[in-house]
């Protein structure tokens, strides 16, 4: 019995994208790193959860460092060499993620803080009493 090849099935071509943006969303519980081209199409992404951390360990700077490293490795395969970093959120993984992106061989041209600041919008959650 001869095995038929599927008609129309083509291998997905990888586009070489040298310049892009890196979005780092750092919350208190997790850090998500997304690498995109200049139009905003996602090239690679990683979070502390996908890097193998669970629970409260996802909020640590080391977890953010590993997540950024994973995302940078995936993006380097697509040819990403230069990024502008946009950081959002108050989490502890902000600086660690940026340092990890620089250490992985990606050239960081600019770092911008795009954390949304309310003009007295929603009421914040009540204080924790431990």
From Swiss-Prot:
InterPro entries: Ribosomal_uS11, Ribosomal_uS11_bac-type, Ribosomal_uS11_CS, Ribosomal_uS11_sf
Subunit structure: Part of the 30S ribosomal subunit. Interacts with proteins S7 and S18. Binds to IF-3.
Function comment: Located on the platform of the 30S subunit, it bridges several disparate RNA helices of the 16S rRNA. Forms part of the Shine-Dalgarno cleft in the 70S ribosome.
A Gene Ontology molecular function term of the record: rRNA binding
Lineage of producing organism: Bacteria, Bacillati, Chloroflexota, Dehalococcoidia, Dehalococcoidales
Organism: Dehalococcoides mccartyi (strain ATCC BAA-2100 / JCM 16839 / KCTC 5957 / BAV1)
Signal peptide interval: none
UniProt name for this protein: Small ribosomal subunit protein uS11
Entry's Gene Ontology BP terms: translation
């Amino acid at each position: 019995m001869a095995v038929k090849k599927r008609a129309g099935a083509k291998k997905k071509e990888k586009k070489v994208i040298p310049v892009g943006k890196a979005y780092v969303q750092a919350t208190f519980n997790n850090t998500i790193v997304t690498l995109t081209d200049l139009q905003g199409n996602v090239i690679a992404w990683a979070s502390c959860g996908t890097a193998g951390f669970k629970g409260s360990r996802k909020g640590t700077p080391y977890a953010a460092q590993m997540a950024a490293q994973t995302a940078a490795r995936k993006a380097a395969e697509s040819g990403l060499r230069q990024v502008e970093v946009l950081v959002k959120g108050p989490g502890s993984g902000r600086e660690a993620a940026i340092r990890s992106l620089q250490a992985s061989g990606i050239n960081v041209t600019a770092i911008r803080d795009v954390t949304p600041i309310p003009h007295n919008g929603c009421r914040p959650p009540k204080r924790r009493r431990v």
